[in-house]
Amino acid sequence: IIGGVGKDDFGKCLLDRLKSDGVDVSHVIENPKKATGCAIVTYFDDGSRKFIFHMGNTPAVEAKAPQKDVLDGVRYFHVMGCSLFADIEFAKEILKAAQTAKKIGAKVSFDPNIRKELIGEKETDKILENLMRLTNVFLPGEEELLLLTGKETVEEAVEECFKNPELEILALKQGSRGSKIYTKEKTVETGIYRIQPVDATGA
């Protein structure tokens, strides 16, 4: 994982959890002068959510794209979309890292995780467009899919995405309705587990 945390209890908690799960955190910066960024999720009675982001002073944006030799052997390079909106220079580093990963033969997977609260900067939109061109595995929700393609229906949006010759799989997340997996050849609908949801964030 590439990013950054503050040298605070929240940052320590995150690093400890990642380490316990076997994640290599050697490319995570620890900055004693800045606070670990966070996102707060608010829930409403109708089941909708709103995200409040506190990333203005996050050390994560200081992370740099790793050198090519660091990525040797990497088969998939995953990008979490909300990181693109934390800082324009950080977004450029993310794109640079994805480009390096492609050059060594890795696949790029992209979960846009984009909220309307984060969109607006033209320069960031251009980086997003370039990242989409590199993407082999795309993991949007319905709202994100329509937002990113500018289309009115899911079918039109999926068709637009597959104009990218690099795209191999589009996994559309549909919440309580399960998900649909699209490839150029076929579409597969997945089933769902019938549960009483407690918290959908990060599920």
Task: Briefly describe each language-model feature range.
Residues 2-81:
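Conserved N-terminal subdomain of the carbohydrate kinase-like
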Residues 22, 103-105:
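Glycine-centered short loops/turns at secondary-structure junctions
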Residues 90-96, 121-129, 152-158, 192:
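Charged helix-capping and loop-helix junction motifs
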Residues 99, 103, 151-203:
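Conserved phosphate-binding/catalytic region of the ribokinase-like
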Residues 105-112:
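Short beta-strand/loop segments at the ligand-binding rim of alpha/beta enzyme cores
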